[in-house]
Amino acid sequence: MEYQRAIDSIEECLNKQLRLSSEKVDQYVLIENWTSLVGHLKTLHSLISNYTNGRELQNEISSLLKQDKELDLQIQDCMREMTSIYDTHLPKTVSGRKRQKVNAETLLDYGRKLSKFSSAPPGYNPETGQDAKAPVHYPWPSEDQMRKTLLFQFSTSMVPNLSATASQLFSEQPPKTNEPTETETEIDANKAVEEKTKMNYPASPTFTTQEENKEVESPANKDVFAGFDLFDPEMEEDF
């Protein structure tokens, strides 16, 4: 559009110049026509120069696009090669790898974090199994617990046979009477002896020696565990 407009303007100025030349006009009119013609020629020249620059830029763009395509092809080739290297040189599975051994100290530290206690319980001796100063917990109930049970009450109110069982003790319970029995009288006598000797019995009978047990032994202290096969730590020490 701009080229056509510039060319039309130039043709119009030339036709006007021919017409003015045939006519007798003032020279200022001719100079003005020539000035406009020169301006249109400059415009056409600038358009032509711009067109030339555009062609050069287009050629450069074409060359750059060509280089871009070539670089894309090179990148694709490099990616294919990298993929092939990954498939051939790196292991496909991790099952064949050697597993690293864990140190024992690491396992112990981890176990201390998970466990309730980080060390052995107080009073524990690996050689004897229990410290001499620590309280001993036997698998049978203590004397205080036995005094509060029905088994002790039945044993103090009647004299069972050596082969009597717990069910027989419950079934052979005599009827209760308001009069004190012989066993209750013996228990009162036993309490009087304990007050005189001022001895405090511990929670477990194993803490008292045999001599002390002999001093306070009375007819009321019957063998409650008669007929029962229980573990005795004193017999274990003899062996």
Curated annotation (Swiss-Prot):
Record region (Disordered): 168-221
Subcellular location, record wording: Nucleus
InterPro entries in UniProt: Mediator_Med4
Chief localisation class: nucleus
One annotated Gene Ontology cellular component of this protein: mediator complex
GO molecular function: transcription coactivator activity; transcription coregulator activity
Matches recorded under Pfam families: Med4
Function: Component of the Mediator complex, a coactivator involved in the regulated transcription of nearly all RNA polymerase II-dependent genes. Mediator functions as a bridge to convey information from gene-specific regulatory proteins to the basal RNA polymerase II transcription machinery. Mediator is recruited to promoters by direct interactions with regulatory proteins and serves as a scaffold for the assembly of a functional preinitiation complex with RNA polymerase II and the general transcription factors.
Similarity field: Belongs to the Mediator complex subunit 4 family.
Subunit field text: Component of the Mediator complex.
Protein name (record): Mediator of RNA polymerase II transcription subunit 4
Organism ancestry: Eukaryota, Fungi, Dikarya, Ascomycota, Taphrinomycotina
